[in-house]
UniProtKB/Swiss-Prot annotation:
The keyword Lipid metabolism does not apply. One of its GO terms (biological process) is isoprenoid biosynthetic process. Gene3D superfamilies: Aldolase class I (3.20.20.70). Homooctamer. Dimer of tetramers. It comes from Symbiobacterium thermophilum (strain DSM 24528 / JCM 14929 / IAM 14863 / T). Pfam families: FMN_dh (PF01070). Its main location: cytoplasm. It is found in: Cytoplasm. The keyword Cell membrane does not apply. This is Isopentenyl-diphosphate delta-isomerase. Belongs to the IPP isomerase type 2 family.
Amino acid sequence: MDLRQQRKRDHVRLAAAWQERRPPPAAAGPGAGWEDVHLVNHSLPELALAEIDLTTSVAGVRLAQPVVINAMTGGADDVTAINRDLAAVAADLGLAMAVGSQTAGLRDPAVADSYRVVRRVNPKGIVLANVGSDATPEQARAAVEMVEADLLQIHLNAPQELRMPEGDRDFRGRLEAIARMVEEAPVPVVVKECGFGVSRDVAVLLHQAGVRAVDVSGRGGTNFAWIEDRRAGLSDPDPGLQNWGIPTACALAEVAALGLPELDLIASGGIRHGSDAAKALALGARAAAVAGPVLLRQQREGARGVMAYLQQFLTDLRAAMLLAGAGSVAAMGQVPVVVTGFTGEWCRLRGVDLMALANRSER
């Protein structure tokens, strides 16, 4: 059996298993930080739930909803059904969707349909292609063409690669490779971490390279270090490496505080509910992305389960926005937000002005 295809199957199986671990094991470490982020109740919102405007944009591409079905899978025949189900739900709800890493499809045309199915099922939706940071401009263009993508997602995942027995060990030249893809890609580029968090320093480098959007993808969601340790059969994995990364709320807050012009932020990692997404919008994200909870429901209940979950997610997002007094995604970025606990301490030490966040007002 092809090693890459088997790895795809392993990732789906173990990602679903991770989501089912409630409460999470001690090795899971701290969460994404959303429990430390508090929206201030607005008792006189003067808003109607049906009129909450969820439209937003990322890198100049308009999104009907500020929620993205994030990259999960592709590259093996038996995961095609997963992408088919997710694409059908994305089409019905008007959600953008990213495919999983297309390296397998670029190397083996026989599995390319596991990605192409997304565009076939959702011909008018927003689709994100997906390549690694070591891809060439030619590979990036081919990935975009494969799914007729509107955006190109470039993923960063050094901690996962180092835990993977067959993973990369040399990460030199990645920023230069990203800059070349940005220059030559036919669509805007979104750079995405894979659950380990983008720091403000890396965000500056990506911005200087011309990247238009960053998915901070912090710790607190699916733990790919844990997944790779399970795949490798480690009996005593290093907890410091298995729990490596910046919690999502911390990463988002410190990157948003930079105020980098023309750099849109997406938040992912531990976003399980609509209120989590609302908190992400308040901290500066233009959209929130979800993967693990969606995959778990697809594995358990198929497209119907995914549809029910995401419908409730959007309903709860609208409710949280109304209760915070925000009638739009832009307005949500101006409501007061109080950050406490570990997340607050991280932000304070990293120079985020928490007093300004807590005392601002959209009105």
